Curated annotation (Swiss-Prot):
PROSITE patterns: CK2_BETA. This is Casein kinase II subunit beta. The keyword Phosphoprotein applies. SUPFAM superfamilies: Casein kinase II beta subunit.
Length: 235
């Protein structure tokens, strides 16, 4: 393969099955040390991982040590994910994610009344390893587990807790209107009042069966009295 046909690490990573939620971070952004402030304290093998992301030649000892190479690969994936979480809060990053949002790359809301509203990736924590990525519906304002299992192992910290909200703050024109229809439970054609379940639960909580009755024993005050006349006498 010629050098002109070689694929960059970033393009390769984003093209992996299960990484469809990621966009390609601009190389200029990665090379700016200001954008990486503090990440060296979070990512092991930081220097080697950054070199791998930027397609710089690895050290000879890394090439000769498969175990070390695997560790650097894992560190590079983590580092790229954390860089990605910062990048998609920038104007350029938001623009790239909007393109994916409009084509439905992040899936569609499973709620019937949201009418297949496109969703956005969201993290429930900004700390790596705490929660996997979820999908956020801006129409019903709720969070769902991604439909495809291949996205169930993507760390939510690589998208952050604030990305969808930043996108709609910068581009309010993309925020959909809230759904006008709301599901109403019915029984025999009649609407079930919202208090019906609450009253039912309250009634169940107030009903307490006597303990002895639960065990199939008569209540204490109903126990037969000991009658001396009925007890057989020993001869």
């Amino acid at each position: 393969m010629s050098s002109s046909e070689e694929v960059s690490w970033v393009t390769w990573f984003c093209g992996l099955r299960g990484n469809e939620f990621f966009c390609e971070v601009d190389e200029d952004y990665i090379q700016d040390k200001f954008n990486l402030t503090g990440l060296n304290e979070q990512v092991p093998n930081y220097r080697q991982a950054l070199d791998m992301i930027l397609d710089l030649e690895p050290e000879d000892e890394l090439e000769d040590n498969p175990l070390q190479s695997d560790m650097t690969e894992q560190a590079a994936e983590m580092l790229y994910g954390l860089i990605h979480a910062r990048y998609i809060l920038t104007n350029r990053g938001i623009a790239q994610m909007i393109e994916k949002y409009q084509t439905g790359d992040f899936g569609h809301c499973p709620r019937v009344y949201c009418e297949s509203q496109p969703m956005l990736p969201l993290g429930l924590s900004d700390i790596p390893g705490e929660a996997m990525v979820k999908t956020y519906c801006p129409k019903c304002i709720d969070v769902y587990t991604p439909k495809s299992s291949r996205h169930h192992h993507t760390d939510g910290a690589y998208f952050g807790t604030g990305f969808p909200h930043m996108l709609f703050m910068v581009h309010p024109e993309y925020r959909p209107k809230r759904p006008t229809n709301q599901f109403v439970p019915r029984l025999y054609g009649f609407k079930i009042h919202s208090l019906a379940y609450q009253i039912q639960l309250q009634a169940a909580a107030n009903f307490k069966m006597p303990l002895r009755a639960q065990r199939g024993q008569p209540p204490k005050d109903e126990e037969p009295e000991n009658n001396a006349d009925t007890v057989p006498k020993r001869l």
